[in-house]
Amino acid sequence: MPKSVIIPAGSSAPLAPFVPGTLADGVVYVSGTLAFDQHNNVLFADDPKAQTRHVLETIRKVIETAGGTMADVTFNSIFITDWKNYAAINEIYSEFFPGDKPARFCIQCGLVKPDALVEIATIAHIAK
C-alpha cells in the first residue's frame, strides 16, 4: 500500500523537510510535535501542562485526519527538557489516554527551540 501524507486543515508548515504525519498499511506515524503556533513560535513558555495539552491536541488532529482516534495510539516517544516537569506532563498525558495506555519511552534532552519543554512522536494503528 502506498504511503499517504497527513496534513490536518490549518496546520502550519514545518521549518524542516517533513510532514505532520504519514499513513501506510493502517499505521499512522506522527512526526515529533511541539507546542508551536501557525508561525512556528513556541506557545506557553514555562508551562509544561499547556504545552503538553497543545502537543497532544495537535497529534489527535493528525490521527483523526487519518481516520483514527487516540485509542488507536500504540506507542509514544516523549522528549522533555527537565525532569521537574515529568509529573505535570504525565497529568495531562493521562487525560488523553484514560484507558489502556500505549507503550512509550521518555527521555530528557535538549529540544529544537529553547522555550520548548516537551516533544512527542506517535505511532497509531487504525482498525480496518
From Swiss-Prot:
It comes from the Bacteria. Keywords: Hydrolase. Disulfide bonds: none annotated. One of its GO terms (biological process) is nitrogen utilization. InterPro entries: RidA_CS, RutC, RutC-like_sf, YjgF/YER057c/UK114. Pfam families: Ribonuc_L-PSP. GO terms for molecular function: deaminase activity. GO terms for cellular component: cytosol. The keyword Secreted does not apply. PROSITE patterns: UPF0076 (PS01094). Its EC number is 3.5.-.-. It catalyses: (Z)-3-aminoacrylate + H2O + H(+) = 3-oxopropanoate + NH4(+). Homotrimer. Belongs to the RutC family. Involved in pyrimidine catabolism. Catalyzes the deamination of 3-aminoacrylate to malonic semialdehyde, a reaction that can also occur spontaneously. RutC may facilitate the reaction and modulate the metabolic fitness, rather than catalyzing essential functions. PANTHER family: 2-IMINOBUTANOATE/2-IMINOPROPANOATE DEAMINASE RIDA, PROTEIN HMF1-RELATED. This is 3-aminoacrylate deaminase RutC.
